């Protein structure tokens, strides 16, 4: 019978060989640690896709910011813009059935009729806003009028019909804002006696304007949500003019040293 024995010294030496050295650290890895940092490939978002989403978010925020700025500017202009001066005054003019060579302060008061209106002047924007209240004459309509010297346009809003009419600005009749402001100051101070004559201008309605955005801020504000039409001017004469058509309405106003009757016919 043979007895097999092991050298204990040799076994201890081999065991020591497998042990880490005193200056080294032993790394113990748990069995389930292999899959800790692994992810499902379907859950991984490509870098390019993340970058595209980032750009979309940036552009969306930029558009929202631009909309807020533009909307705020529009609301400020719509609600906070105030005219430089507001006047409520009138002008006297000779009746159509009376002929005088020149208006005179000595003429009897019965020979004159009076137009009163509310005038707002935006001198910096070169815009005049005229509000004609319900007149004492049955043959004239109340209206709001905008003269925009930047756009070179005039717009009439007939308050009886609730319709807008646009025509190129007639600078031979309409005073520039600064000159009109001086005239109103003189009338208010009493240095100018507003007794004058009546000018007739005859307009014909032509095409309907579907989009009024290009007509400028002030005309847009006047005519927004209103039926808006173009006008064509026939002729402007001083004195009496016979009304050719029954389908007409008149707006009497002034923005000069004389009164104007704007006759608009379909």
Swiss-Prot record:
One of its GO terms (biological process) is negative regulation of amyloid precursor protein biosynthetic process. Homodimer; disulfide-linked. Interacts with SPPL2A and SPPL2B. Interacts with APP. Mature BRI2 (mBRI2) interacts with the APP amyloid-beta A4 protein; the interaction occurs at the cell surface and in the endocytic compartments and enable alpha- and beta-secretase-induced APP cleavage inhibition. Mature BRI2 (mBRI2) interacts with the APP C99; the interaction occurs in the endocytic compartments and enable gamma-secretase-induced C99 cleavage inhibition. May form heterodimers with Bri23 peptide and APP amyloid-beta protein 40. Residues 102-134 are annotated as: Necessary for interaction with APP and inhibitor effects on APP processing. This is Integral membrane protein 2B. The lineage of its organism: Eukaryota, Metazoa, Chordata, Craniata, Vertebrata. Residues 1-54 are cytoplasmic. Keywords: Amyloid, Amyloidosis, Cell membrane, Cleavage on pair of basic residues, Deafness, Disease variant, Disulfide bond, Endosome, Glycoprotein, Golgi apparatus, Membrane, Neurodegeneration, Secreted, Signal-anchor, Transmembrane, Transmembrane helix. Belongs to the ITM2 family. Plays a regulatory role in the processing of the amyloid-beta A4 precursor protein (APP) and acts as an inhibitor of the amyloid-beta peptide aggregation and fibrils deposition. Plays a role in the induction of neurite outgrowth. Functions as a protease inhibitor by blocking access of secretases to APP cleavage sites. Residues 76-266 are lumenal. It comes from Homo sapiens. Changing residue 60 to V: Strongly reduces intramembrane cleavage by SPPL2B. The ectodomain C-terminal part of the imBRI2 is processed by furin producing a secreted Bri23 peptide and a mature BRI2, membrane form (mBRI2). The remaining part of the ectodomain of mBRI2 containing the BRICHOS domain is cleaved by ADAM10 and is secreted (BRI2C, soluble form). The membrane-bound N-terminal fragment (BRI2C, membrane form) is further proteolytically processed by SPPL2A and SPPL2B through regulated intramembrane proteolysis producing a secreted C-peptide and a BRI2 intracellular domain (BRI2 ICD) released in the cytosol. Glycans are attached at residue 170. Disulfide bonds join 164-223, 248-265. One of its GO terms (cellular component) is intracellular membrane-bounded organelle. The chain crosses the membrane at residues 55-75. Ubiquitous. Expressed in brain. Residues 137-231 form the BRICHOS domain. GO terms for molecular function: amyloid-beta binding; ATP binding. The record marks 243-244 as: Cleavage. It is linked to Cerebral amyloid angiopathy, ITM2B-related 1: A disorder characterized by amyloid deposition in the walls of cerebral blood vessels and neurodegeneration in the central nervous system. Cerebral amyloid angiopathy, non-neuritic and perivascular plaques and neurofibrillary tangles are the predominant pathological lesions. Clinical features include progressive mental deterioration, spasticity and muscular rigidity. Cerebral amyloid angiopathy, ITM2B-related 2: A disorder characterized by amyloid deposition in the walls of the blood vessels of the cerebrum, choroid plexus, cerebellum, spinal cord and retina. Plaques and neurofibrillary tangles are observed in the hippocampus. Clinical features include progressive ataxia, dementia, cataracts and deafness. Changing residue 170 to A: Accumulates in intracellular compartments. Does not inhibit furin, ADAM10 and SPPL2A extracellular proteolytic processing activity. It holds the Pfam family BRICHOS.
């Amino acid at each position: 019978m043979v007895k097999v024995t092991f050298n204990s010294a040799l076994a201890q030496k081999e065991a020591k060989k497998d042990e880490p050295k005193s200056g080294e650290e032993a790394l113990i890895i748990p069995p389930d640690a292999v899959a800790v940092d692994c992810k499902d490939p379907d859950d991984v978002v490509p870098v390019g896709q993340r970058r595209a989403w980032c750009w979309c978010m940036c552009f969306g925020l930029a558009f929202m910011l631009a909309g807020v700025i533009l909307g705020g500017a529009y609301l400020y202009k719509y609600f906070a813009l105030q005219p430089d001066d507001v006047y409520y005054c009138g002008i006297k003019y000779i009746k159509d059935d009376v002929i005088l060579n020149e208006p005179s302060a000595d003429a009897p008061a019965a020979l004159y009729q009076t137009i009163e209106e509310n005038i707002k002047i935006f001198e910096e924007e070169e815009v005049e806003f005229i509000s004609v209240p319900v007149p004492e004459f049955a043959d004239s309509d109340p209206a709001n009028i905008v003269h925009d010297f930047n756009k070179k346009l005039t717009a009439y809003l007939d308050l009886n019909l609730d319709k807008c009419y646009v025509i190129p600005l007639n600078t031979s009749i309409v005073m520039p804002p600064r000159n009109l402001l001086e005239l109103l100051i003189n009338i208010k101070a009493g240095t100018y006696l507003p007794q004058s004559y009546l000018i007739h201008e005859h307009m014909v309605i032509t095409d309907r304007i579907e989009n009024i955005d290009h007509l400028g801020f002030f005309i847009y504000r006047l005519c927004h949500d209103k039926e808006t039409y173009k006008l064509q001017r026939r002729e402007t004469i001083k004195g009496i003019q016979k009304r050719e058509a029954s389908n007409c309405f008149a707006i009497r106003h002034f923005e000069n040293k004389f009164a104007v009757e704007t006759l608009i016919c379909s």
